[in-house]
């Protein structure tokens, strides 16, 4: 449903942000 799609989108954004942060730190 809508919530699942929203959570999925947020998860993807969070994952990309985490990867970016890790790359900058490392």
Swiss-Prot record:
One of its GO terms (cellular component) is extracellular region. Its main location: secreted. One of its GO terms (biological process) is defense response to bacterium. Pfam families: DD_K. Expressed by the skin glands. Keywords: Amidation, Amphibian defense peptide, Antibiotic, Antimicrobial, Secreted. InterPro entries: Dermaseptin_dom (IPR022731). It comes from the Eukaryota. The modification Valine amide is found at residue 26. Disulfide bonds: none annotated. It is found in: Secreted. Has antimicrobial activity. Belongs to the frog skin active peptide (FSAP) family. Dermaseptin subfamily. This is Dermaseptin-J1.
């Amino acid at each position: 449903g809508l919530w699942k799609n929203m959570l999925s989108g947020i998860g993807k954004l969070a994952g990309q942000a985490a990867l970016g942060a890790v790359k900058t730190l490392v």
